């Protein structure tokens, strides 16, 4: 409705609760785009300075051809003691860790690699906690029917292999949104639990090789750093949302964002990967993305 009325739209991720709804939204956005209407999806982790720097390094060819991707999003707040809420009810949330967490890391992997996923296989979906305490009702429980864990393997169009894992039952991991890329010339890795740091390892002289930690807080050298505090002063979770909002406003003003913003068409590709993973888990076979329309 808003797109048809010519309004720019920013949407939470994932794009929709179902593939069909996501497709309808992407189609509506494509039609509205012909009239200059823009869409955005709130994949805020792209706006972390370290992730934006990783994007730039990959585009500069510092890693060479990407061979492997390992992505994870591990949290520990969803144990059996956690009271029932909308997040654990499929009719409201749509999915559990898959839509909540895998959506982020699939988007991040696609964003960094710069290619689409071509096939998903080896997927596993589990619901371990099927009853949860009802808030304010001592001794009573309610049904929890979303996935607690979804993990899967994938291939990118250019041949790179990938693994994805999402869970809210990993004790000791509060918000470990992490990714590692291995290329022919180097590797990089990031974890949101150390969000101001990007780790980089470039091949070459074995005497001086190895991982180095880059504090992404230098104005003029690191994305978004000039917008905040003096050099070496770190930022936090909330600053990613501000960076996102700033890039949206820059785009609406006709300026370039620091790094590309996901629109409905982009987010629909992530939704297709999520759907392929669920089909792979339930059918116990490989699913080509060409099958997911």
Predicted regions and their residues:
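Stable alpha-helical structural segments in soluble proteins, enriched in small hydrophobic residues
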Residues: 236-240, 244, 274-283
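Aromatic/hydrophobic pocket-lining residues that form π-stacking "cages" and hydrophobic walls in ligand
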Residues: 25-28, 54, 276-277
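Short acidic/polar mixed-charge low-complexity motifs
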Residues: 158-160, 169, 184-187, 285
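Glycine-rich phosphate/pyrophosphate-binding beta-alpha loops
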Residues: 103, 165-173
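Beta-strand-loop-alpha-helix segment that lines the small-molecule cofactor/substrate pocket
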Residues: 1-46, 61
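C-terminal lid/capping helical subdomain adjacent to the catalytic/cofactor pocket in oxidative enzymes
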Residues: 268, 282-293
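C-terminal glycine/acidic-rich active-site capping loop/insertion
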Residues: 111, 133-145, 151, 155-158, ...
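Predominantly a Rossmann-like dinucleotide-binding segment in NAD(P)-dependent oxidoreductases
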Residues: 35-40, 45-144, 198, 284
